[in-house]
């Protein structure tokens, strides 16, 4: 399961999406997330699915790789769907057993929430798959730079977020390595119920924390040896600049959000 977690991984390429400015991809992802919560009809969700499919296709990412990012959180998606199915109020009861009942409204709401989570994760995965950590840091820093006037440390925040994102696959690889080493010594992580498996994971914590601190120290030494002193006075080999493809991407995602907003509230405004 650990090998199936793809958060923080970068897939090199030269597609339309890879060549976009990182600021464009970050803002487009945020706008798409807003658009997800504007959707309220099957047609709107169909448009969102089609748009996500188009972006994945244009990015030339392996479809299996993109959907692999969903595997570790399928249980969360399923639990979210079930909770909404059983707790949402409704009149048309589809299933009833003792105190539990599933209504048509609950089934629809649960399906909507599950689809929203899937779309959110898929689109966010495209951002990390098509943007290297260094470029992502530059993009976040540029977006946060206007807030420096109120004391926001733009460069430091961007660096921390990127290092944290990059450390996720590193720590997962380390966890997998420790599990294999302990399995070779007779440890069993696959048998037993959920509680027993969780208890079997406890011996992993100490070596994992030790490894994490060691890697953090190695990273700090490497940055210091390269004379890293923060963002002040730093220059870059490649300066970020918006191009025609960035404006095209902005126009597409803004049209998507505006169109979904019009579908949701347009009829109400016309009635007024």
Question: Where are the language model's segments positioned?
Answer:
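Alpha-helical transmembrane segments and their membrane-interface exit regions
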Residues: 51-61, 76-79
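Membrane-helix interfacial "entry" motifs
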Residues: 14, 37, 60-65, 97, ...
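Juxtamembrane/interface alpha-helical elements of multi-pass membrane proteins
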Residues: 73-187, 194
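Alpha-helical transmembrane segments and their helix-start/interface "positive-inside/aromatic belt" motifs
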Residues: 25, 64-74, 246-249
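Transmembrane helix-loop junctions in multipass membrane proteins, especially transporters and channels
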Residues: 41, 45, 60-64, 88-96, ...
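Transmembrane alpha-helix interface motif
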Residues: 1-44, 48-57, 142-145, 149-152, ...
